[in-house]
């Protein structure tokens, strides 16, 4: 699985100077003359600032424009990025050595101070980063205090020992800390670039340190990137132009793919799965992904503030029917929030999983009646989702289940991505579609999302027992002990139902047969354009 770094009680040293993850073209391969790729993304990126990114549309582009201390290979294992080696004697104080040929797109060196500035900016309340919590999750000293306004950004536990040595101090030992540094939130930004003005992320202005630079952007139409000639491994970059097309309708993206306008789609309509398998064999992929599709309930206001209502709604979602009939592309029912493919997680059987849907429906009716709802007083609520045919399809199916089994009147509401994010962040919903794809391959990436102080806690769930068991998990020294804590946390989620996990993701997409180097088996779907190339066809 993803945790490739071995941990011992004494000295820990990882040295990978000679390794890199780039396009590896086999000897004898005949490349196409035109190395231009068109990638589909599901929506217009909300921001190209790593500290302001929140969703996959922008993250996919940001991974081409910036590079962190480490990268992931095709299996999700950690490989060098800007850092060539890292070490720790106690899993608490980490030292990273940066490569001396890492440069920004303007040719200036990438230094340890760039990382200090960027990470301090991430946690600075003035930045309003939706991912500031990630620094606290990683346990960087004083991160949470800075986020809470109780300390200043310069007190963050990160220091530039010299231009090429970065020292990070954690508030507790964390064996998988290096894995976390692959996250986009920890990508460096150039101080002079950020401070040049509000339009620093526009084409011609943005100065990244990734394999590509932003050449063109037409909002809601396309983003075009071309090789960064100053990138340290640019000699191995094969693709000379990558165009990202934001299309939130899977059918439209699939139509463009079949017409030859797109080389990779981020998804495809579920109802086309069998037809696509027949029409374009070898181009349809559905490997498991480190992600869960779920509905979040507003636990602070409205009818879903009542735990009985939330639990009844969760129980009447027929997850077996959803995965087998509504979706039907290899997804698994989500009886818990943490996906089965997560490293270090062995789930205990859920009571829901051991009951028939008829039994679940019967118990749900009793719960809803106890909450004061029934034929004379039907439950009314709004189900919000971001615009997408697949999301709509699932919402219609769930609304039908709730109406048929509980008599619930459901109003379906769809919003474009940016509006949906605003509604989600302000708590303007009863029930909202959500998903989480792990930021790293360990159960805490999912379960900490529901802790009371987490900015990603969409449902506003506040449960001291839940917070306590996850805090305990972070101090455990063995996988077995952590697994017990994680299962205890999952039990609380099942009983309190701040969310209703629906299914575990598969990474459904279409890929042209002449495109090579796509890391289809990366569990987190981390795909850098610089590893890909097009063969003659």
Curated annotation (Swiss-Prot):
User: Where in or outside the cell is it found?
Assistant: Periplasm
Q: Which CDD domains match?
A: PBP2_OppA
Q: Quote the record's binding site residues for L-alanyl-gamma-D-glutamyl-meso-2,6-diaminopimelate.
A: 42, 54, 56, 289, 424, 435, 437, 439, 506
List the SUPFAM superfamilies: Periplasmic binding protein-like II
* Entry keyword Protein transport: yes
* Protein's UniProt keywords contain Transmembrane helix: no
Instruction: Return the Pfam families for the record.
Output: SBP_bac_5 (PF00496)
Q: Mind listing the UniProt keywords for this protein, alphabetically?
A: Peptide transport, Periplasm, Protein transport, Signal, Transport
Q: Which PROSITE patterns match?
A: SBP_BACTERIAL_5
Signal sequence residues: 1-22
Any one cellular component term from GO for this entry? periplasmic space
Record GO biological process? dipeptide transport; heme transmembrane transport; peptide transport; peptidoglycan-associated peptide transport; protein transport; tripeptide import across plasma membrane; tripeptide transport
Q: Which GO terms describe its molecular function?
A: oligopeptide binding; peptide transmembrane transporter activity
Q: What is the effect of changing residue 296 to E?
A: Cannot bind murein tripeptide
* Primary localisation category: periplasm
This protein's assembly is summarised as:
The complex is composed of two ATP-binding proteins (OppD and OppF), two transmembrane proteins (OppB and OppC) and a solute-binding protein (MppA).
Physiological role = Part of the ABC transporter complex MppA-OppBCDF involved in the uptake of the cell wall murein tripeptide L-alanyl-gamma-D-glutamyl-meso-diaminopimelate. Is involved in the recycling of cell wall peptides. Binds the cell wall peptide L-Ala-D-Gly-gamma-meso-diaminopimelic acid. Can also transport ordinary alpha-linked tripeptides such as Pro-Phe-Lys, but with much lower efficiency than OppA. Cannot bind typical tripeptides such as Lys-Glu-Lys, Lys-Lys-Lys or Ala-Ala-Ala.
Q: Family, per the entry?
A: Belongs to the bacterial solute-binding protein 5 family.
Q: What is this protein called?
A: Periplasmic murein peptide-binding protein MppA
Species of the source: Escherichia coli (strain K12)
**Higher taxonomy:** Bacteria, Pseudomonadati, Pseudomonadota, Gammaproteobacteria, Enterobacterales
